[in-house]
């Protein structure tokens, strides 16, 4: 969902797009708590912020687990460790449309779903602490955590539009900041726990933190309006999927996602391979998540002021510079930190272009009526596809790397093929910009 992180802006938009309320109906409920202000609204906002931090902070810090598992038997000899993180993140994107539509169809069960999701997340982490194989970790730390996180997270995202009307943008911005804050703190905390107590205790400690931190949030995440006054499930027009313009946007989105998750998976291991101190990887991840937040704002501002392909091209060029220059030529910690900042900003901000894709498609629709929530959900699913594929693909790329010792800088570190693939993936993410030049958009 993080966004935040951008990691999560796309999921928030998905859950809240096209929510409208009848003003006369709201006036008829004088006993309702006020929107945009008041104790109840602020407690709701604080609960959403906490859920954002808890649900998305853990997946975005998986790189520290990836490094730890790679040095620990029996996981190290099995392979497929990266699949834990990519399947976890991929499901949280790919399953988002289905979870969102289900909760919209049965709104009375939102709070029950949130509680069930929290139980599933905690159970997944506790079960993972007893695992002795990679497939078991994929099923628990990967699948169970992801599905539970979605069901816990989406009821809150769907209700922000009820509590904040005039100040809705500010509310979403504050919620998204939760991922950035957790991205700065969580990698260091997890690294310390892993180094001191091992993965089993670390997973159990995080399950306790998650349970204690999220349980009050489930209580405070409640609707402001009576359930009957919210939009109900309705048929959705999908004619835009027959048009080439949508698939140009989606294709670039999938291409970009194929390489986007790889740096967060391999930065800690890459830093260790160059002999950097143990704190280098977690610090780079923290900088990545911090820049993620600023990137979403930057790219989102460009989307509001220019055609979406301008924002896509800026994001693409920024990623190319980050990967091919600052990662590919990195021989020092400073270079790696600059890479994390640039890639977090421009790569993380790429998802902010989704709303611009909606605007571009609406301008080309004669009636102008396109369900923006569906488009955003499909873009999120596309990103999830890329996330899932990138896991096994990255391990294959590392296995065929023959540049080690034969190329300079990071290209000869054993991660050279991975660096190039990430850069090429980012470049192909600019497909829509080429489509604009060819007058296809």
Predicted regions and their residues:
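Helix-to-loop junctions at the C-terminal end of transmembrane segments
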Residues: 94-109, 295-308, 326, 398
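Cytosolic juxtamembrane N-terminal segment immediately preceding the first transmembrane helix
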Residues: 1-57, 112, 220-239
